[in-house]
């Protein structure tokens, strides 16, 4: 019975509403924590997952063996792979496309790759001006990988204990 009476008085005095208004008033006059984005940037996590890249072996041969595990594991169905057999009997990709509008940057493709071919880089800033530019093809992915290979290798070596 006493519990109902206290609940009645709390509701009558609108204590929950006043508590919420006090919290709003308290944060209204505190300094805001903002970043002026293009000029200032937040520090990135060492495990940040950004734009994709395809890697090569040190001899220049691409690493991808067209096992299609990344295509199978992708929850957003953003990866499309076509493959063909070469003269020596190995499989290689003829087409490797990633639709960045579909991709959710979960990192499953990177985790499932048995030869560390597909990796996600630290690149956060990219834009598209025309229709169809959101689909990154194999030559573009290889170019990104070639340009950032030393940084990718350093990041993977630093993160090796957690893989």
Curated annotation (Swiss-Prot):
It catalyses: a quinone + NADH + 5 H(+)(in) = a quinol + NAD(+) + 4 H(+)(out). Keywords: 4Fe-4S, Cell inner membrane, Cell membrane, Iron, Iron-sulfur, Membrane, Metal-binding, NAD, Quinone, Repeat, Translocase, Ubiquinone. The keyword Calcium does not apply. It is a peripheral membrane protein. It is found in: Cell inner membrane. It is an enzyme of class 7 (translocase). Its main location: membrane. Its EC number is 7.1.1.-. Residues 54-84, 94-123 form the 4Fe-4S ferredoxin-type domain. GO terms for cellular component: plasma membrane. GO terms for molecular function: 4 iron, 4 sulfur cluster binding; iron ion binding; NADH:ubiquinone reductase (non-electrogenic) activity; quinone binding. Binds 2 [4Fe-4S] clusters per subunit. SUPFAM superfamilies: 4Fe-4S ferredoxins. [4Fe-4S] cluster 2 binds at residues 74, 103, 106, 109. It comes from the Bacteria. GO terms for biological process: aerobic respiration. Its cofactor is [4Fe-4S] cluster. NDH-1 is composed of 14 different subunits. Subunits NuoA, H, J, K, L, M, N constitute the membrane sector of the complex. NDH-1 shuttles electrons from NADH, via FMN and iron-sulfur (Fe-S) centers, to quinones in the respiratory chain. The immediate electron acceptor for the enzyme in this species is believed to be ubiquinone. Couples the redox reaction to proton translocation (for every two electrons transferred, four hydrogen ions are translocated across the cytoplasmic membrane), and thus conserves the redox energy in a proton gradient. Belongs to the complex I 23 kDa subunit family. This is NADH-quinone oxidoreductase subunit I. It comes from Xanthomonas oryzae pv. oryzae (strain KACC10331 / KXO85). The lineage of its organism: Bacteria, Pseudomonadati, Pseudomonadota, Gammaproteobacteria, Lysobacterales. The gene is nuoI.
């Amino acid at each position: 019975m006493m519990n109902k009476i206290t609940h009645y008085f709390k509701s009558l005095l609108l204590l929950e509403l006043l508590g919420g208004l006090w919290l709003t008033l308290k944060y209204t006059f505190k300094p805001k924590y903002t970043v002026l984005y293009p000029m200032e940037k937040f520090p990135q996590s060492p495990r940040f997952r950004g734009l994709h890249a395809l890697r090569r072996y040190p001899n220049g041969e691409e690493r991808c063996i067209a096992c299609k595990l990344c295509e199978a594991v992708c929850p957003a169905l953003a990866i499309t792979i076509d493959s063909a057999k070469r003269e020596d009997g190995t499989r290689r990709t003829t087409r490797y496309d990633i639709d960045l509008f579909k991709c959710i940057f979960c990192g499953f493709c990177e985790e499932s790759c048995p030869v560390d071919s597909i990796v996600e880089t630290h690149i956060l800033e990219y834009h598209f001006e025309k229709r169809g530019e959101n689909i990154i093809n194999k030559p573009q992915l290889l170019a990104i990988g070639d340009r950032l290979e030393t940084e990718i290798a350093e990041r993977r070596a630093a993160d090796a204990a957690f893989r």
